[in-house]
Amino acid sequence: QVFDLAILDIMMPGIDGFEVCRQIRGGAAGSNTDMPIVFLSAKTEEFDKVLGFTLGADDYVTKPFNPLELTARVKSQLRRYTQLNPNSGARETVNNEITIKGMSINRDNHKVIVDGEEIKLTPIEFDILYLLASNPGKVFSTDEIFEKVWNEKVYEANNTVMVHIRRLRGKMKEDTRQNKIITTVWGVGYKIEK
């Protein structure tokens, strides 16, 4: 069975939510590796949140939670996912492609090609990369990235954006490239040069 979204608790019987997230992102049992993953957990420590995002979560909601807020977050993730998933039938295909720094990003089919190799990104990772690439040379602070990608105000400082940028860099093999795609402007934010 194919799912569009997973809501996981960290403390589940038999297998914890972190392991389920790891297996989904790893393609276990034919799972939809790109589907949004939302953690819903009583664990409120920053370590648990960062670990969840590092493993591939797109959102993390702590208990107790407001059911209306959770519903809004799920709808937001599904909306982003259906916009980026070419098989959803939710939008018409229009040539919406950016080519920059040896990388091609196609918004219509959610494909990213770096140095001739396709890389798989979660919807959040894709949105961050697309935001930076569609504004070459512009520096975005972590708060600006969070507000534009998650469509929410930042109420407290967190490492969410930095964790996603780190995962993006890992998938694009930034550590082996001489010309980095995503540049850190220390104390300011991130950008992709023209």
Q: Predicted segments — roles?
A:
Residues 16-19, 48-51, 75, 127, ...:
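Active-site phosphate/pyrophosphate-handling residues
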Residues 2-7, 12:
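Active-site beta3 strand of CheY-like receiver
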Residues 96-111, 188:
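Short boundary/linker motifs that mark transitions into or out of structured domains
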Residues 18, 22-26, 34-99:
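Basic, amphipathic DNA-recognition helix from helix-turn-helix-like DNA-binding domains
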Residues 2-4, 28-36, 154-155:
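His-Asp phosphorelay/catalytic-motif detector in bacterial-type signaling
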Residues 111-181, 185-188:
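Positively charged, aromatic-enriched patches within helix-turn-helix-type DNA-binding elements
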Residues 2, 54-56, 64, 69, ...:
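Conserved functional loop/turn residues at catalytic and ligand-binding sites
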